[in-house]
């Protein structure tokens, strides 16, 4: 992959990971039941960005973990903060575990791209 495109992809995935952190923030709000309508609106926006950006990342780099289906299942299952706040503890922990698995998978992809970036930088000199 061209060095400039690799740099752009790394920045894109870093930004994507920040959105995943925001998603986790909203999970915390749902768990504590401390959220309002604006939080609900922002949660929907974060989910939209996560779904759209996933497609852009998939078009640029191949990976199997996390799978598109896993990401869509998590986003689709988290319909609203109100819904999440009503989940029993076991179901909520399962949701958090799904989030963590996806987040770690994305971090791994980012790490692999940074290795490529370093190798590309070394070969360019």
Give the predicted meaning of each segment:
Residues 1-125:
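Conserved non-transmembrane functional hotspots
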């Amino acid at each position: 992959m061209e060095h400039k495109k690799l740099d752009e992809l790394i920045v894109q995935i870093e930004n994507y990971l920040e959105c995943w952190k925001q998603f986790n923030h909203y999970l915390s709000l749902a768990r504590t039941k401390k959220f309002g309508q604006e939080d609900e609106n922002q949660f929907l926006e974060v989910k939209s960005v996560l779904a759209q950006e996933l497609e852009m990342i998939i078009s640029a780099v191949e990976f199997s973990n996390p799978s598109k289906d896993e990401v869509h299942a998590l986003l689709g299952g988290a319909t609203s903060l109100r819904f999440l706040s009503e989940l029993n503890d076991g179901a909520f922990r399962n949701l958090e575990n799904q989030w963590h698995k996806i987040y770690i998978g994305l971090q791994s992809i980012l790490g692999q791209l940074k290795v490529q970036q370093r190798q590309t930088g070394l070969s360019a000199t």
